[in-house]
Amino acid sequence: MFGIASSLFELGGLIVMHDADGCNSTYDTHDEPRWYDTPSMVYVSGINEIDTIQGNDQRLIDNIAEAVEAAHPRFVAIGGSPMPNAIGTDFKAIERLVAARTGLPTLGFRTDGIHSYLPGAGGAYVWLAKTFLKAPHRKPQKPAKRVNLLGLTPLDFSVVGNATTLKQIVTDAGFTLQSSWSMGDTLDTLAEAANADVNAVLS
């Protein structure tokens, strides 16, 4: 769940953590250092006991639709926590309902809030590529010149200058930075990532 939120944080989408709030509010206050200077739309759904017992997903869908009308995001992403995972919430069905109601590209991903953030971040990146990536309009260069940085989030690299340093290493070596997935870049720039000659995967 935190992986989805971190990888999509800067890209203009509405990101929903389907949870009762509680300890997962720490994403806002502790785990996401970009909150201090970068606006985003990351929310906790506030699922309650009755909704959990009855399997009521309608309130979540209604709240997302209301937030979309108010905030005008580029897309919607919904990730799960231990409670929805335990009751078998159908995130793909919610994805389809939200997409039909809002008309926006929507990701519903069954994260569980228990394991590593890597599957969530990776799944979000795959969805981004399938949904927004445009066909390349430049021919590959030999030797390679244009570089994508993949996997750049503060969960691994913090906000103490590491992202800037990595980008500087690329440009100082004579390469052109095509896109950064996903610190310091926009959704429109990421959509042009197929024009790169090589991907550098960061870990």
Describe every region a protein language model picked out:
Residues M1-S203:
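An N-terminal assembly and electron-transfer interface module characteristic of large anaerobic redox
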